[in-house]
């Protein structure tokens, strides 16, 4: 089991203090080594590429926990069953979003295998990622999982 970073240290290269703070326990979750060094690392690299291309992204990352997830340290630390990443490109027109859910284990294959709608992440987490968007815009953006809009 690795300490999987929610905000990767590689995204904080502007400042040594920021890099150091990325190792705080508030920024890590128990993540299987196969995920942390495999599919999740590939997704983090892709997000960095998209950020360079689109100038700015909003990125939300977190665990998806549910009853029955395994635990560590005598039940004090839950091992999430999955992780999500919700990404918005707010500075491009039309605005676009994409979400990913990766099970906490080996995740092979391409990004499209794990792409999902923001609505699905909201359903699993109980969170509302873009509450200030007008309802029609929120519904349009959150209901689809169009990875093609990000790769072209």
Residues of each region from the PLM?
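Domain-level detector of nuclease and nuclease-like folds
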Residues: 1-152
């Amino acid at each position: 089991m690795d300490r999987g970073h929610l905000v990767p240290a590689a995204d904080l290269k502007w400042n040594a203090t920021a890099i150091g703070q990325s190792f705080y326990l508030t920024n890590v979750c128990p993540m299987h080594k196969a995920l942390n060094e495999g599919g999740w690392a590939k997704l983090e690299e892709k997000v960095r590429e998209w950020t360079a291309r689109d100038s700015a992204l909003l990125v939300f990352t977190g665990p998806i926990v549910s009853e029955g997830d395994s635990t560590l340290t005598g039940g004090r630390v839950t091992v999430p069953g999955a992780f999500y990443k919700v990404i918005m490109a707010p500075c491009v027109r039309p605005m676009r979003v994409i979400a990913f859910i990766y099970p906490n284990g080996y995740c092979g294959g391409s990004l499209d295998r794990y792409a999902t709608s923001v609505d699905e992440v909201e359903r699993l987490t109980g969170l509302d990622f873009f509450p200030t968007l007008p309802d029609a815009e929120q519904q349009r953006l959150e209901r689809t999982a169009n990875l093609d809009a990000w790769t072209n």
